[in-house]
């Protein structure tokens, strides 16, 4: 078998890896094998954490909405609020509801009371 000299192609590839890993600490930014391993690990972690970020933000929005609802003092929960919202087909997503709850509480309470009234009215009509 003939010998293949990789020359500048290998250097170019390794240089790309080194630029990616330039901010890593110690051997993780200096040794070629550990650079490639750390690159794979970093990319896997970034992919995983991107999905975790979505999950954490959703739980944050739910917590904020629930806190404002329970602050009203009524024995009403987030679960009942979202159920009533879907029952009257008012589709405001959790992100927007959480922002309204934080920035403009009076407006959120207006929405909350409307949803409660509509849901109670529909429930009353269905019973009778």
Swiss-Prot record:
Pfam families: Ribosomal_L20 (PF00453). One of its GO terms (biological process) is translation. InterPro entries: Ribosomal_bL20, RIBOSOMAL_L20_CS, Ribosomal_protein_bL20_C. GO terms for molecular function: rRNA binding; structural constituent of ribosome. Keywords: Plastid, Ribonucleoprotein, Ribosomal protein, RNA-binding, rRNA-binding. SUPFAM superfamilies: Ribosomal protein L20. GO terms for cellular component: plastid; ribonucleoprotein complex; ribosome. The keyword Plastid applies. It is found in: Plastid. Belongs to the bacterial ribosomal protein bL20 family. HAMAP family: Ribosomal_bL20. Binds directly to 23S ribosomal RNA and is necessary for the in vitro assembly process of the 50S ribosomal subunit. It is not involved in the protein synthesizing functions of that subunit. This is Large ribosomal subunit protein bL20c. It comes from Epifagus virginiana. The gene is rpl20.
């Amino acid at each position: 078998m003939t010998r293949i000299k990789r020359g500048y192609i290998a250097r170019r590839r390794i240089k790309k890896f080194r630029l990616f890993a330039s901010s890593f600490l110690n051997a993780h930014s200096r040794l070629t094998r550990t650079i490639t391993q750390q690159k794979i690990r970093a990319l896997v972690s970034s992919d995983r954490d991107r999905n975790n970020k979505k999950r954490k933000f959703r739980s944050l929005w739910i917590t904020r909405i629930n806190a404002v609802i329970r602050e009203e003092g009524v024995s009403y929960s987030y679960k009942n609020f979202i159920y009533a919202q879907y029952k009257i087909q008012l589709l405001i997503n959790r992100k927007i509801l959480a922002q309204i709850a934080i920035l403009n509480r009076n407006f959120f309470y207006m929405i909350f009371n409307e949803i409660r009234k509509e849901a109670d009215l529909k429930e009353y009509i269905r019973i009778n």
